[in-house]
Design a protein with these regions (language model features):
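A short, conserved, highly charged catalytic patch centered on acidic carboxylates
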Residues: 1-119, 126-149
């Protein structure tokens, strides 16, 4: 089934249920059952990757946070803070069928004009790009992998 396709992330034991052709899972961060879309499948895997493989505390991970950009409401997929409440990681998730293009990078860069986060990630579950932003020297560097928390 394409909806639950394997991703380039470790598999996690989600509790998936099917009802009338819709698949759902329990989102442990939002504490509710959600419908699985291809983008949500990627988001849920990446959240588990952050928690289980990279050591990010789940209490510091926010999902689909609202923000205003040039007067328009937007939503970030994943925003992680440190224990001081400072934003440290912004993740933009796309469905596996969505190519990671310059337009996707432009989108996350626009979001980061608001958030000013030092680590950015763009993923479609198959490809992952990690970037460290140096605001002082106005530059960025792509990273081979996401740093541990």
């Amino acid at each position: 089934m394409d909806l639950l396709q394997p991703l380039n992330l470790p598999p996690y034991p989600f509790k998936i249920t099917e009802h009338n052709g819709e698949y759902t899972l329990f989102d442990e961060l939002r504490k509710k059952t959600i419908i699985i879309t291809p983008e949500e499948w990627v988001r849920q895997h990446f959240v588990q990757y952050l928690i289980k493989d990279k050591g990010y505390p789940k209490t510091l991970i926010g999902l689909e946070g609202g923000m205003k950009l040039h007067g328009t409401a937007r939503r970030t997929d994943i925003l992680v803070r440190n224990n001081k409440g400072e934003k440290v990681l912004l993740v933009e998730c796309k469905a596996p069928s969505v190519a990671i293009t310059q337009g996707v990078f432009d989108q996350v860069a626009r979001y980061n004009m608001v958030h000013k986060v030092p680590l950015l990630t763009v993923t479609n579950g198959l490809q992952h790009y990690y970037c460290r932003i140096d605001f002082v020297n106005e530059r960025y560097d792509f990273l081979e992998e996401l740093p541990e928390y």
